[in-house]
Amino acid sequence: MKLAYVWILAALMAPSVFAAMPPVSESVNAQGSSPIFGVTIPAGYRQWKLIAPSHQTGSFNELRAIVGNPLAMTAYRKGTLPFPDGAILIKLAWKRVPSNEFKGAFVPGAATTVQITVKDSKKYSSTGGWGFGRFINRKPEDEAQHKTCFGCHEANVKNHDFVFTRFAP
C-alpha cells in the first residue's frame, strides 16, 4: 500500500520537477557567458558532426577538432556563404603530444580551450554577424581576450564569411 502512495506522489511531482529542468537545447553554461558577446557553451555539442580537424603550430602547438550544429553542417555541405543565422561552430583544442604507442604520431594531450562562434547577423552586426566565446575549463576568458577575436577573423578570412575552417568531406 505504501508503494502505491510513493508512485502517486511521484506522478504528481513529475511535472514540477521536469518544468524546473532546462530544456535540452538550453545552454549548459548559463552562469558563464562570454564578455562582449554573451555566447555560452551549447548543450550536447560533443555529439555534433565533425567539420574538420586542424593543427595549430608555433606557441599554440595544438590539435583541434571543429564541430558544427546541424544548420552549420548543412551550410558546409551545400557550400552556402554567408552562413545562415543560427549556425554555430565550435573548436575544441588540446595540446599536441607525442604518442607513446606509435613513434612519429601525435595525440591530444591536455584540453586547452573551447572556442565558439555563433551566427546572428542582427545581434552581432558590428562583428561580421558572428558572436565569439572562448572558454577554458568551461569558464569564459576575459574581455581583453574576446576583443581580439573579430580582428583576427576580419584580417584573415573576410572573404569566407569570417570563418577559417574549411569542410573536410
Model-based region annotation:
Residues 64-74:
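Short, structured beta-strand/loop micro-motifs enriched in basic residues and often containing a Trp
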Residues 6-16:
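Bacterial N-terminal signal peptides
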Residues 22-29, 34-64, 80-169:
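Sequence context surrounding c-type heme c attachment/ligation sites in exported
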Residues 1-4:
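Positively charged n-region of N-terminal signal peptides that target proteins for export
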